[in-house]
Amino acid sequence: MTEPQFRSKGPELLVELSQHVADTVKTVTELDPQTAELVGNARFAKHMMTVWGGQNVYFPMGISWRASQRDLQIYEEFDGRNHSALAKKYNVSLQWIYKIVRTMRKEELLAKQHTQA
């Protein structure tokens, strides 16, 4: 199926997903737009049809993933004295900053202990 045919006859989810893939490929690589479209439409869409065809697919909102990314960013910015500034910047409570720092320190310590064992 050519690209225009795929856009007009492809299932809506696959068409939209393949366009997002093409846009992402264009953004993160130096591929020309036509090649990026080929990757998204021809390769990715066909692969998804083969792998997940006929299945109901659920895409989580990624709330816990985004929160863990935010927590890591907070911990990296933490300097021992900027609890309040971080709470304001990330729109969380001061207690939440303390909890994040405590949790991240514990995880860091466990990781060090496992590498030394």
From Swiss-Prot:
What role does this protein play?
Answer: Regulates pectin lyase production in response to DNA damage.
Listed GO MF terms: DNA binding
InterPro entries per the record?
Answer: c-mor_Regulatory_Protein, Homeodomain-like_sf, Mor_transcription_activator
Q: Which residues bind DNA?
A: 82-102
Q: Does the keyword Cell wall biogenesis/degradation apply?
A: no
What is the protein named? DNA-binding protein RdgB
Name of the coding gene: rdgB
A UniProt-annotated Pfam family: Mor
